[in-house]
Amino acid sequence: MAIQLSKGQRIDLTKTNPGLTKAVIGLGWDTNKYSGGHDFDLDASAFLVDAHDNCVNDLDFVFYNNLEHPSGGVIHTGDNRTGEGDGDDEQIIVDFSKIPAHIEKIGITVTIHDAEARSQNFGQVSNAFVRVVDEETQNELLRFDLGEDFSIETAVVVCELYRHGGEWKFNAIGSGFSGGLAALCRNYGLQV
């Protein structure tokens, strides 16, 4: 039975799940019926950051144009441009054993592609969630439903995976940003 988290809750991933080395971070969402006549393309990304909350270089940013971190520790399984259907819309696979030692945190985010041009925002998104699945057993370990707390935001930091005392933990963030992917990149120390 998966643990249901609320915004701000933290939970130990690797300590409470001995043997967990690879996790599937599944992200899903629905878009409301009215979307202004444009396709709604949401994109999941991962920012691998150091102790200063910054990506060391552009390769620490895993997204639809850079599907795999050089370490092999974070892999994006590909862009879903419609969000149609049930279950995960996009997935990011994290192999904790391959994450470089200088990486302290992995920020998992979702943005709306071309949000400003299409007049779209997270106020038009519902049923957004993130879940963590043990890749080996396929057991869902935890789930965080984001709720309907957004309006004008075009980017969301959904959660963070972070190191603590040799273990990996999960932090349910659910924090919205205006300014889309560019704002998130700046937040994590990347030049855009």
Curated annotation (Swiss-Prot):
CDD domains: TerD_like. Coiled coil: none annotated. InterPro entries: Stress/Tellurium_Resist, TerD. It comes from the Bacteria. Belongs to the CAPAB/TerDEXZ family. This is Uncharacterized protein YceE. It comes from Bacillus subtilis (strain 168). The lineage of its organism: Bacteria, Bacillati, Bacillota, Bacilli, Bacillales.
